[in-house]
């Protein structure tokens, strides 16, 4: 592990710290510089003094304002090591507005295509809606980094080119900090693309004519230029989009589009003009003339001149606080500083392990932190529990905020990068955003235990090694030294200190009742209650649970150990009927009312777990239906009619084997890592109550709990047999379920816990019927 080496001298660091004293006063650690960096205190003081000293007004009124704006244009070009001979500077509201300007005005000709990188900011995806291209394609990063379609070392020249294709990508991914090699720019401009990417739309439908176009590059540099030098003499993209608040912290509301001379040639005549962009426009005729100067044609209306003037102090502040040296420029030094911090954080995170050796975090990057030319000052990760389950990024945001740490969570307006780094296929994205209902910017962080986003920390020139040590200490103390319930209690106790959105997230930290499964007929399939459904409880458990059973000709209970096809009988509880279904076309109904059935039924006795059980025979018709579908003679359907108590503590039981309820934790099931769908594995365990704590096998430590205010006592773990080897949807056996549990539990066959409802303490003659509802909060006591 490489030790951290500071880029700045002690004197330089002291000067920087003095400019950001508000962080210490507010006890804040700021780690979201990819969102925006922070302004220096003397920077805004100097900007205000400049406004107080000068009369700065509309540039059409005052020449001084125009001179200031021209100074800023010159300074921007100098900052990127270029001149007005090579690039125009168009002021925009931000990088997004710059991208929109390119999309609206780029001339694709008759055959040009729009290509964009998957790992791009949402604003680049928005360009798809405005470009007038022949086709729209999504490129993988490697299809850009691989360079152009070079043939035999010569430029691929084709006569008669009819179109202009635009390739848009980020110089630095704002999700991971990965930097696409900038030498790809010239290669693509000269040789085109070796592969067009995935076609999303074409004016020709599925058919694509293989035409040869000129290629232009639009570089989204917003994330990159905040902490890295961009040399436009060395790399010459046709369009560069950026926001200045990313670089200076202040002012906001001003960005720029830099357009090369080559890029200007394919900017078409605009469909709109605003004030300041024309020489004249007649009201009585469709006649107008645009300005001669290129940038003036695209700067509609009055510029945000006060913000633009404020940029001068931004440039001066960087040069003052991070002076260039004989070896490195200001931005090169900032790049070295943030990269050094990111490398240190990544090294430290890799060392963090749970007591069982499992890593605390999962990191998301492509090439590691070996070369600042390929990786910037961003670290993206998710936290894992000791069992390997993911901790939701919303919880991390809460814990960090309560420790005074500001960081970013989610997908960071870059769903494509989220998809790539989290390994989400197209169906998974549909599941997260369309079916589960996640939206950009929310704290809906886990879907079926899998993360929908990540935690991101990013650094600026004012970030210190002490800042990152506080981050690391927060992770150690909160996720290596405490249990999940301790964290939840800590967050709940401090919740009033959180911002509104995170307060809402606190309500989601406690596990909830996800699903209830009623098994009306012992050993047959489940009747499931999903959110927001509710279900009544009786003295014996969930109403109608294991109230019927199938017996053979000897009166012995039939189970899946003898007849796996029982799982194919699907009970459906209706208003007054229990309908039994087998396959798509065979079904039979019996009455739900015990009184209705008792009048016509013969009494009989069977056994469950060696205990006698009184029951009512449900008749010959259903018996024949069962025998025909299961292929066994002499079957009967019995319904429990008498009270049955457990031998241990006289709790009232239905036809269950051991306790009123069996509780299962989906996180524990997820730890098995079977290839089959998770829901199918959950079904194997035939539990009544399904929760998800986010931490595997946490339930084995419970002594008591409440669900929606209903109290339960834990009877102990469920000792498993080979019944769980049966796939409850097909009836097929597979032994790996049992062997995996044995391995995870070190030879013990425990999975799920038995629980019993504690009767409510009431003196009412007719106590109120209790219901459980999917979504009820689970509180462990």
Curated annotation (Swiss-Prot):
- Active site (record annotation): 413
Please provide an example of a Pfam family that matches this protein in its UniProt record: MOSC_N
Question: Positions modified as N6-(pyridoxal phosphate)lysine?
Answer: 246
Indicate where the modification Phosphoserine is found in the sequence.
734
Which Cys residues form disulphide pairs?
A: none
Reported EC number(s) for this entry are: 2.8.1.9
Where does the MOSC domain start and stop, copy by copy? Answer: 619-781
In terms of Gene3D superfamilies, this protein maps to: Aspartate Aminotransferase, domain 1, Type I PLP-dependent aspartate aminotransferase-like (Major domain)
Q: Which UniProt keywords apply?
A: Molybdenum cofactor biosynthesis, Phosphoprotein, Pyridoxal phosphate, Transferase
**Transferase is among the record's keywords:** yes
Q: Which cofactor does it need?
A: pyridoxal 5'-phosphate
Pathways involved: Cofactor biosynthesis; molybdopterin biosynthesis
> What reaction(s) does this enzyme catalyze?
Mo-molybdopterin + L-cysteine + AH2 = thio-Mo-molybdopterin + L-alanine + A + H2O
Biological processes, Gene Ontology terms? Mo-molybdopterin cofactor biosynthetic process; molybdopterin cofactor metabolic process
State the top-level EC class.
Answer: transferase
Phosphoprotein is among the record's keywords: yes
Spell out the molecular function terms from Gene Ontology: lyase activity; molybdenum cofactor sulfurtransferase activity; molybdenum ion binding; pyridoxal phosphate binding
Primary role: Sulfurates the molybdenum cofactor. Sulfation of molybdenum is essential for xanthine dehydrogenase (XDH) and aldehyde oxidase (ADO) enzymes in which molybdenum cofactor is liganded by 1 oxygen and 1 sulfur atom in active form.
Say which family it is in: Belongs to the class-V pyridoxal-phosphate-dependent aminotransferase family. MOCOS subfamily.
Q: What is this protein called?
A: Molybdenum cofactor sulfurase
């Amino acid at each position: 592990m490489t030790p951290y080496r500071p880029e700045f001298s002690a004197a330089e660091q002291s000067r920087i710290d003095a400019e950001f004293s508000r962080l210490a006063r507010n006890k804040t650690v700021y780690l979201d510089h990819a969102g925006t960096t922070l302004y220096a205190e003397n920077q805004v003081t100097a900007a205000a003094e400049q406004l107080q000293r000068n009369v700065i007004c509309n540039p059409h009124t005052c020449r001084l304002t125009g001179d200031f704006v021209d100074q800023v244009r010159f300074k921007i070009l100098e900052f990127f090591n270029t001149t007005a001979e090579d690039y125009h500077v168009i002021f925009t509201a931000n990088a997004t507005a710059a991208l929109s300007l390119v999309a609206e005005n780029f001339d694709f000709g008759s055959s040009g295509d729009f290509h964009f990188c998957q790992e791009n900011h949402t604003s680049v995806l928005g360009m798809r809606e405005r470009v007038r291209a022949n086709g729209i394609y999504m490129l993988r990063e490697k299809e850009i980094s691989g360079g152009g379609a070079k043939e035999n070392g010569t430029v691929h020249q084709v006569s008669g080119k009819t179109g202009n294709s635009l390739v848009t990508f980020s110089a630095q991914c704002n999700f991971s900090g990965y930097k696409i090699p900038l030498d790809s720019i010239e290669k693509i401009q000269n040789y085109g693309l070796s592969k067009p990417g995935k076609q999303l739309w074409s004016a020709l439908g599925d058919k694509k004519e293989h035409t040869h176009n000129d290629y232009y590059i639009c570089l989204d540099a917003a994330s990159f230029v905040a902490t890295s030098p961009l040399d436009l003499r060395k790399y010459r993209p046709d369009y560069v989009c950026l926001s200045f608040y990313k670089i200076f912290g202040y002012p906001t509301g001003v960005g720029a589009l830099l357009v090369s001379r080559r890029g200007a040639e394919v900017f078409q005549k605009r469909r709109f003009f605003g004030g300041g962009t024309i020489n004249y426009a007649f009201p009585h005729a469709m006649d107008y003339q645009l300005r001669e100067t290129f940038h003036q044609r695209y700067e509609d209306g009055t510029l945000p001149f006060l913000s633009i003037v404020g940029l001068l102090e931004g440039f001066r502040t960087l040069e003052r606080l991070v002076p260039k040296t004989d070896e490195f420029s200001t931005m090169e030094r900032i790049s070295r500083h943030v990269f050094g911090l990111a490398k240190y954080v990544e090294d430290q995170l890799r060392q963090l392990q749970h007591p069982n050796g499992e890593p605390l975090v999962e990191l998301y990057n492509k090439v590691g932190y070996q070369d600042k030319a390929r990786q910037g000052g961003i670290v993206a990760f998710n936290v894992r529990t000791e069992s390997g389950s993911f901790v939701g990024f919303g919880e991390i945001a809460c814990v960090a905020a309560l420790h005074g740490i500001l960081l970013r969570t989610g997908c960071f307006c870059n769903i494509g990068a989220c998809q790539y780094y989290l390994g989400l296929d197209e169906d998974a994205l549909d599941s997260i955003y369309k079916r589960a209902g996640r939206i950009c910017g929310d704290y809906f962080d886990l879907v079926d235990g899998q993360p929908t986003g990540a935690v991101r920390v990013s650094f600026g020139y004012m970030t210190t090694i002490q800042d990152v040590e506080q981050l690391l200490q927060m992770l150690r103390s909160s996720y290596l030294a405490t249990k999940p319930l301790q964290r939840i209690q800590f967050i709940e106790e401090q919740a009033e200190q959180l911002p509104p959105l995170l307060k809402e997230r606190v309500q989601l930290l406690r596990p909830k009742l996800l699903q209830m499964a009623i098994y009306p007929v012992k050993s047959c399939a489940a009747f499931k209650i999903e959110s927001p459904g509710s279900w009544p409880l009786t003295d014996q458990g969930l109403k109608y649970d294991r109230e019927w059973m199938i017996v053979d000709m000897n009166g012995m209970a039939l189970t899946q150990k003898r007849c796996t096809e029982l799982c194919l009988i699907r009970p459906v509880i209706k208003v007054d009927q229990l309908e039994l279904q087998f396959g798509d076309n065979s079904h039979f109904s019996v009455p739900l009312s015990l009184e209705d059935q008792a009048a016509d039924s013969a009494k009989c006795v069977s056994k469950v777990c060696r205990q006698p059980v009184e029951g009512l025979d449900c008749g010959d018709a259903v018996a024949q239906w069962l025998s025909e579908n299961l292929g066994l003679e002499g079957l009967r359907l019995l319904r429990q009619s008498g009270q049955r108590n457990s031998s241990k503590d006289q709790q009232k039981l239905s036809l269950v084997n051991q306790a009123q309820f069996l509780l299962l934790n989906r996180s524990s099931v997820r730890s098995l890592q079977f290839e089959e769908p998770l829901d199918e594995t959950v079904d194997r365990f035939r539990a009544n109550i399904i929760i998800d704590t986010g931490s595997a096998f946490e339930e084995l430590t419970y002594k008591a709990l409440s669900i929606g205010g209903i109290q339960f006592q834990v009877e102990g773990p469920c000792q498993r047999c080979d019944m769980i080897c049966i796939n409850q949807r097909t009836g097929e056996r597979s032994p790996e379920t049992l062997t995996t549990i044995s391995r995870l539990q070190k030879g013990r066959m425990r999975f799920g816990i038995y629980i019993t409802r504690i009767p409510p303490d009431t003196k009412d003659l007719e106590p109120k019927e209790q219901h459980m509802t999917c979504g009820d909060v689970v509180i462990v006591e």
